[in-house]
């Protein structure tokens, strides 16, 4: 895995390329992200770089969290902490700033976010189940149907697709194209939609697998 950056989803808009085609993009405020911890094989058993994003008042954080930020030499505590696994983390030091200069236009990236919560949803909306007959005599219109056999096994298997809370899950969208990078404003424009609400936290990293871009 390569080092990425943390950002905040601002919303969607569209821009026009040189040929006049409209490109839908998501605007992300990315970084600057201070390095809060560098993990190594000797001390942690694996190599990774932990980044921080956003600011928070000390009163809303625990004392260990405040001490963790002060140990990294940060002027103010950060609200979010995320780490990126790397094969070699020796080139990074606590307090170092990671900015959107990490990316370039045309690059493919993977974006991780938390999907929008939809609340309690039924089988058709949550799992795309088919409906039952809509005839006058039918009583099975949107019901999920059988959820298992009888005495054997005598239980519902774990993971059975059923109605329940929908959304609010970690979602990864792969191989999206960076359309534009604006370093002076800490903004990156990524083609297409990204998971989560406006203001939601995103993790942006170089694409693990390269090939034809989505969109």
UniProtKB/Swiss-Prot annotation:
GO molecular function annotation: rRNA binding; structural constituent of ribosome
Domain of life: Bacteria
A single cellular component GO annotation: cytosolic large ribosomal subunit
Disordered: annotated segments: 134-166
UniProtKB keywords: Ribonucleoprotein, Ribosomal protein, RNA-binding, rRNA-binding
Biological process, per Gene Ontology: translation
Record InterPro entries: Ribosomal_uL3, Ribosomal_uL3_bac/org-type, Ribosomal_uL3_CS, Transl_B-barrel_sf
Pfam families (alphabetical): Ribosomal_L3
Annotated PROSITE patterns: RIBOSOMAL_L3
Family statement drawn from the similarity comment of this UniProt entry: Belongs to the universal ribosomal protein uL3 family.
Quaternary assembly: Part of the 50S ribosomal subunit. Forms a cluster with proteins L14 and L19.
Function per UniProt: One of the primary rRNA binding proteins, it binds directly near the 3'-end of the 23S rRNA, where it nucleates assembly of the 50S subunit.
Protein name listed in UniProt: Large ribosomal subunit protein uL3
């Amino acid at each position: 895995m390569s080092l990425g950056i943390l950002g905040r989803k601002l919303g969607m808009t569209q821009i026009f390329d040189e040929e006049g085609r409209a490109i839908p993009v998501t605007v992300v405020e990315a970084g600057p992200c201070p390095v809060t911890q560098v993990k190594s094989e000797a001390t942690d058993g694996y190599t990774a770089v932990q980044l921080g994003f956003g600011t928070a008042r000390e009163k809303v954080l625990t004392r260990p969290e405040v001490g963790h930020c002060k140990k990294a030499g940060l002027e103010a505590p950060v609200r979010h902490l995320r780490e990126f696994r790397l094969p070699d983390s020796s080139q990074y030091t606590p307090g170092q700033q990671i900015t959107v200069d990490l990316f370039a236009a045309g690059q493919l990236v993977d974006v991780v976010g938390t999907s929008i919560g939809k609340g309690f949803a039924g089988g058709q909306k949550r799992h795309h189940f088919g409906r039952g007959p809509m005839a006058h005599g039918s009583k099975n219109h949107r019901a999920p149907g059988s959820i298992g056999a009888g005495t054997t096994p005598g239980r519902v298997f774990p993971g059975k697709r059923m109605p329940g809370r929908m959304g609010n899950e970690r979602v990864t969208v792969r191989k999206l194209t960076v359309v534009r990078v604006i370093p002076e404003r800490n903004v990156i424009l990524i083609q297409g939609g990204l998971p989560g609400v406006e203001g939601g936290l995103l993790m942006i990293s170089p694409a693990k697998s390269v090939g034809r871009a989505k969109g």
